[in-house]
């Protein structure tokens, strides 16, 4: 990392082959001065691939500038709230925000936002990530890269995962109104056991189908 130079990138790739390593991952990390996914970045990727082809090693791309994978070095989450990670909390206290969900009993719920990561439950977010990161690599290098390393994609752990796609998805899966059931995710009332099982099944399906599967299919 720091400021990349193709000659130094080739030297490092060659050294890894010399000591018996079968390949390497091209991973942007803290301290990188070269613009990630810019022309100079790809010049260095080309240099590393060329050296791997000479040495018979494997050149793998890492799909993010840091981790967890999915935010596209800030370009995906930078598109706004629709693309940013969201979560629900249940807390006693005064009103904190105007971003409100109200259930049929008049209980107010508020979702909070992590602006530094993305909503991995919404497929449009994943397709934008693929467009900004995966497709430029393929356009430039085709099958000369062995594959991609994707690291720690995740749902929110700050509260219960939330996404704007959830109410409609829950309705389609269970024929029920999720907004009316939100209190059951936090308190042992109503059909809370069933609601929680359904909720986490939905979260699992959304993450698998809307984040992991599009990347796998690509």
What are these regions (language model features)?
Residues 8-19, 37-211:
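Mature extracytoplasmic enzyme cores
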Residues 1-34:
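N-terminal-proximal low-complexity accessory segments that begin disordered
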């Amino acid at each position: 990392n720091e400021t990349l130079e193709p000659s130094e990138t080739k030297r490092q790739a060659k050294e890894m082959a010399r000591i018996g390593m079968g390949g390497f991952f091209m991973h942007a990390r803290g301290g990188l001065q070269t613009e990630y996914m810019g022309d100079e970045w790809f010049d260095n990727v080309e240099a590393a691939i060329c050296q791997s082809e000479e040495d018979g090693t494997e050149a793998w791309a890492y799909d993010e500038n840091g981790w967890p994978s999915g935010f596209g070095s800030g370009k995906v989450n930078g598109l706004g709230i629709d693309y940013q990670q969201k979560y629900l909390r249940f807390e006693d206290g005064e009103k904190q925000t105007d971003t409100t969900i109200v259930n049929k009993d008049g209980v107010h719920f508020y979702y909070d936002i992590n602006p530094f990561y993305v909503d991995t439950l919404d497929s449009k977010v994943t397709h934008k990530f693929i467009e900004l990161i995966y497709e430029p690599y393929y356009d430039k290098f085709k099958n000369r890269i062995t594959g991609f390393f994707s690291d720690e994609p995740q749902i929110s752990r700050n509260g219960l995962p939330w996404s704007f796609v959830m109410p409609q998805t829950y309705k389609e899966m269970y024929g029920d109104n999720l907004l009316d059931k939100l209190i059951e995710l936090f308190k042992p009332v109503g059909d809370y056991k069933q609601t929680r099982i359904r909720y986490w099944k939905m979260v699992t399906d959304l993450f698998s189908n809307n984040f992991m599967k599009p990347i796998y299919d690509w």
